Amino acid sequence: MNSNIEDDPWSSGWNDDNDNNNNNNTSINDPLTGATATTTPYQSSYLTSSQLFTSTGGGGSGSGGGYNSGVNTYNTTIPPNLINVPSSYETIYSHFITKYNNNNNNNNSNSTFTLNDFEINIIDKLISLNYLTNYQKQKILDIIYENNLLPINQSFKFYQILGLLALEIDVPGTGDYVTLQFRLNNNLPDLPEKFINEIINEENEQEEQTSGLLGNRNRSIQSHSHFGPNNQDDWNIDDSTTISGGGGGGGGNFGDPLLVDHSYIHDDLIDESRSVGGTQPQQGGGGGSGGGSGSGSGTIAPNVDSSYIEKYINDIKDQFKPLFSGIDLIKIKEVPEKEGIIFKHINYMITHDLKIGGTSSGTKKVIRRYSDFVWLMEYLLEKYPFRVIPGLPPKKFTGASPDSQFLQRRRRGLHRFLNQLIKHPILSQEPIVQSFLTVPTDLTTWKKQAKIDSSLEFKGQKIQTDFINVIWPIMGEPFLKKWRQAEENIQFIIDKWVKIIILVERYERRQQQISFDNGKFAEMLNGFSKLNTKIYPDNEDNNNSTRNDVNVNVVVVDNNENYKQDFDFNSSGDIININQCLNSIGEFFNKSSQVLIDESYIINTKTLEKFKNYLDYLNSLQELFERTKQLSINQIDLLDKRIKDQEIKFKKISEENPDIKGGELIKLRQSIINDKQEIFQQLNKDWLIKQCCLQEFIIFQETQFLITELWVEWCKDRLKCQEKLVGLYDNLNQEIIHDMPLER
């Protein structure tokens, strides 16, 4: 009745079984490739978290990887082709891609040319030739990640990165993204000729010493994951086909950094003895383990049994109760008066009896605007990007019909948003959420004097050793596989559920139409019974007509009394009995019409909302997948490679001539220490993200019972309706069988 979803799925071949081959299905956007996703004709018009975030300009980044709306990390625009590419760029690109393809052909591999290879073979070479400094290198790498200049093997992005390097070499400080775009296709500087010659004349031994162009990071990964037959390293397996790390491998990560397990790096940093003084990680340092005695993902504590893991899972699930159970925790209604001098807006009254935020028991009422809901969602996205956050209904529906219908749909969407928030075990404890539901004053005024901390939820936290050493070794592999499987299929599941909602709405509209038709039945039968005696005259009608005509009556009575008695057409009064039964049938249609109206109301206000509530959870999970791909990007592999290369260099210089190059050794040692501190911070964040996503995935499993709840109630409500209709049919049947004549 009030659907915001496309009405006719049949026109698009909606019942095809081959959903995976259907071009109408939406593919998951990949922020690393910049691929433009196709859209499905069944997209919900509800505002999802990523849509809201990308449409707003607010929200600074939290520590450790929060949202930063000013950074273009999810650019899916297909860029135009570069023209006037400097010849040096083409030389470099041709040189590396040719060697890359030849190496793939020789080794029968299908590995990917990564940014790590670019850094080793180009950026580090420029540093060794004193064209760039390490600070400038880090600045360029940050620009690459922030502006999505990946994957590196695309010529357009390869040339842009070379342009950044050339600009920085030409005039230090100008190697930024804005300057690059301004000078794109117009007068980009050439790379130094000396550098070009060095690259072209590079010897094979030097290429091997720096891990080579095709130095695949997963060679090291495979050596730690024991993946493959006979525990042999497979040098040709890349990230696109393998998830490796603690507990074994799983499917490809298709651009999702969450699916890369860095447990092997944690093992290296903890277990290997570093010869560079003072770089051994400390107990509980800001790194991935939180301690130096853990066994890592490769070893499972011998005393861990399945009951411990089951308790861990059940404890998380017990915190989340998504079922309605006939209770609305929070109610919301529109305040009749529209406020605003020029631009009118709707206020919403939120009512609840929740005891939250240290408030006393009793009913609480607060007034909020739609913009207040938007602010709350922006805050949650910034602080809890790795949580399942429900979406908001849009400010305005596309093609919204009557204003009252639009407002009703938006109010219901806000109602679902608040009830899903308050049922979430983490979000419900957020002070801002509690203040939103309890502060009686205007929220804009309250925000001016309130202290609001929007930094990432696990800022300053360290991952627990129990998670790394006990939970992850057992749950890591199956979780990554199930996460990937869910991420691949979530859009198809959403499409199916949207079509189910369409059918429910059609069923409701049909019940309304049947109710309308039943009313027409009663009206037409009543009119028919009043007129049918004109063609089926009975004895009573004949007597009435003779009394009204005195002259005729006199003649008839005096001269033709016997003939009059013989001339009656329907002396038995059958038409009267028939009309009385027709009136009973009309009453049946009126009563059944009311039953169908009641059923339609229940579907529209209760059943359909539960179907859409479950759809909201599906959309929220899909949004979590997309945010995780965007925000869990890290440089762990790059840092690990750089540390190992620097340690090799440190050892080599120490053995050759430590006295002469003492200053260089000090700088190198400090660089190693800095990189280790950075990698431990990034490992810690990576572990915390994985822990958070694992918890959310476990919590989401409880939503499966929403499917049971809504279909059980669907059946109960339909049964009640049918029982009422059957009772009406039975009474009508008994009446007309005995009272409606079939013959004289």
UniProtKB/Swiss-Prot annotation:
Function according to Swiss-Prot or TrEMBL: Required for vacuolar protein sorting.
Q: Where in the cell is it found?
A: Cytoplasm; Membrane
Protein name from the UniProt record: Sorting nexin MVP1
Instruction: Give the PX domain ranges.
Output: 326-444
Q: Key word Iron present in the record?
A: no
- GO terms under biological process: protein targeting to vacuole; retrograde transport, endosome to Golgi
Instruction: Present the record's domain note.
Output: The PX domain binds phosphatidylinositol 3-phosphate which is necessary for peripheral membrane localization.
**What are the record's GO terms for cellular component?**
cytosol; endosome; membrane
Q: Give the protein family.
A: Belongs to the sorting nexin family.
In Gene Ontology terms, what is one molecular function of this protein? Answer: phosphatidylinositol-3-phosphate binding
Annotated region Disordered: the residues are 1-40, 218-252, 273-299
Q: Where is the composition biased (Polar residues)?
A: 26-40, 218-243
Regarding the membrane, this protein is recorded as: Peripheral membrane protein
Cited CDD domains: BAR_SNX8, PX_SNX8_Mvp1p_like
* Location, primary (coarse class): cytoplasm
Q: Which UniProt keywords apply?
A: Cytoplasm, Membrane, Protein transport, Transport
Q: Which InterPro entries does the record cross-reference, listed alphabetically?
A: PX_dom, PX_dom_sf, SNX8/Mvp1, SNX8/Mvp1_PX, Snx8_BAR_dom
Q: Where is the composition biased (Gly residues)?
A: 283-297
Gene that encodes the chain = MVP1
